Amino acid sequence: MPEYDFDGQVAFVTGAAHGQGRSHAQYYAKHGADVVAVDISHNKETVPYDLGTSDELAETATLVEEEGQEVLTLEADVSDEAEVAAAVEEAVDQFGKIDVLANNAGIESSAEATKMDEAMWDELIDTNLKGVWLCSKHVGQHFIERGDGGKIVSTASTSGFSGIPLGNAHYVAAKHGVRGLTKTLALELAEYDVNVNAVAPSAIDTPMVSGMVEAYGEEILDEGGAALSGPFNIFDPGEMLEAKDITEAYMWLSSDAARYVTGITLPVDAGFLAK
């Protein structure tokens, strides 16, 4: 991984208990940042796999500390504005500032649009889209008040570029929404020297994906490739990307190297969208 200089900075990472969020937290620390590691630490009714736990969040904290950086762990649901506001306030109280917001928290479930119940739709949209807005709102307010710029990076998806007829209507809608929100926030916050971007992964080897496979079977990935004109990875068909591949993009977009990059959604998809 290239070297970045986040010395003296503070990164606020959501969904940090495992998967991509843990990877992001660890690498922000590796490059010199202190970390606010946030996760929900309880399950959601319509999600068919276990979400991050308190023990996993503590393990992430240990990884950050092993890199020689300070860490604050917070349990919060990104879909709850009061909890988000309190988490941001506690982070600023602890470290004095936030420099980078990593909007990584997300969930997945599956049902055809005409059969999906409202609770499943609401829980996913509330986490994957509303949660990105709420965290961006409250950290964005801090950036404006502080007057020293900032970075917001959010996890979109290749599902934000196309329709997917595999019980993913809510997920597709949310990720399209993240792309639109990213562009709008970039325009609104440019005058405050805040860069706002997103990353669009394809299939990543994380607890979320393995949880979906366990809940719905291997065919959920096989059918995905068939419905979407080929494999998720054109270099190594059948192989998923690793969390660190997405972290690479997060680090770049959070760094001064991407000073004049804003409003984009960067695919890290092993050629998936090229087809």
Describe every region a protein language model picked out.
Residues 3-37:
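Canonical Rossmann dinucleotide-binding motif of NAD(H)/NADP(H)-dependent dehydrogenases/reductases
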Residues 31-59:
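Conserved glycine-rich Rossmann-like NAD(P)H-binding loop of the short-chain dehydrogenase/reductase
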Residues 84, 112-113, 120-125, 231:
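Substrate-binding pocket helix/loop in short-chain dehydrogenase/reductase
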Residues 95, 239-268, 273:
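C-terminal substrate-recognition "lid" of short-chain dehydrogenase/reductases
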Residues 115, 218-245:
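Catalytic Tyr-x(3-8)-Lys segment
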Residues 144, 153-177, 182-191, 203-204:
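Catalytic loop of short-chain dehydrogenase/reductase
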Residues 190, 195, 261-263:
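Short, small/polar-rich loop/turn modules that mediate ligand/substrate recognition or access, typified
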